[in-house]
Amino acid sequence: MNFQLRIQRIAFALLAVAVAAFSMTNVLVTSAYAQGIPREAIPVNPPQPVDNDGKIEVLEFFAYGCIHCAQLEPRLAAWVAQLPADVKVKRVPANFASRGIESGPIFYTLEAMGVLEKLHQKLFDAANLENVMLGHPPTLNKWLEKQGVDPKKYEEMQKSFSVQTRISRARKMNGDYRIESTPSIAVNGRFMLSGGGEQLFPNLDQLLAHVRATNKPVALATPAATAAPAKKK
């Protein structure tokens, strides 16, 4: 009997913790809606640290094998190009392999080689439109060679400490933000939007306005992400 009572008490305690966590999430979401935040925006709990540089940080979590990310990229680039100077957009590769492609090693290696911006969209197109098996090293090497990238230098760069460090930081950031799907976009460590529907950019603009109005940065952190190019106003 004592053993059964202990089991029941443990079960009730676990249930109470789950109910409390669910209730806290509901409180955060309800409070956010009351402040005029888009219904599609999910509060990040707990809020994540951002750079302490006075700019609003937008993170795009993506995967090269994700067709929705591929479709979003041109629209996102156009949105980034018209952003004011108080906003910075950074890309963070997803942890999971989409279409067998691990985006992080490719992304950070090409960034270190100085050819990322030239090949970023081409990687999406190769994976999703041309069905190139970028997750297969020999196939990736052949594709890189066609783009003017030396496969041997690519492999050497990927093994470098700086690239491996950025890959590790990106993986941690994925865990901190609990990324399970792409595209996912985080705004200033406080709100998350998923998918690339037509309402995405109006929702992002609304969140930027909200962050400017509240102006409550979380803390200083060293990001793993890479800034997307933007035109300054």
Predicted feature locations:
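C-terminal cap of thioredoxin/glutaredoxin-like
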Residues: N2-L5, A63, K146-K233
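Extracytoplasmic thiol/disulfide redox context detector
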Residues: N2-S98, R171, A213-K233
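Stable alpha-helical elements in mature extracytoplasmic
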Residues: G54, H68, L72-R75, E102-S103, ...
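Loop/turn elements at helix/coil->beta-strand transitions in domains of secreted/extracellular proteins
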Residues: G54-E57, A85-K88, M113-H120, D150-K152, ...
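Solvent-exposed loop/turn segments at secondary-structure junctions
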Residues: Y64-H68, N95-R99, D125-E130, S160-V163, ...
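Sec/Tat-exported extracytoplasmic proteins
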Residues: G65, L76, V80-L83, L110-G114, ...
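Structural microenvironment flanking redox-active thiols in thiol-disulfide oxidoreductases
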Residues: L83-M113, E117-E145
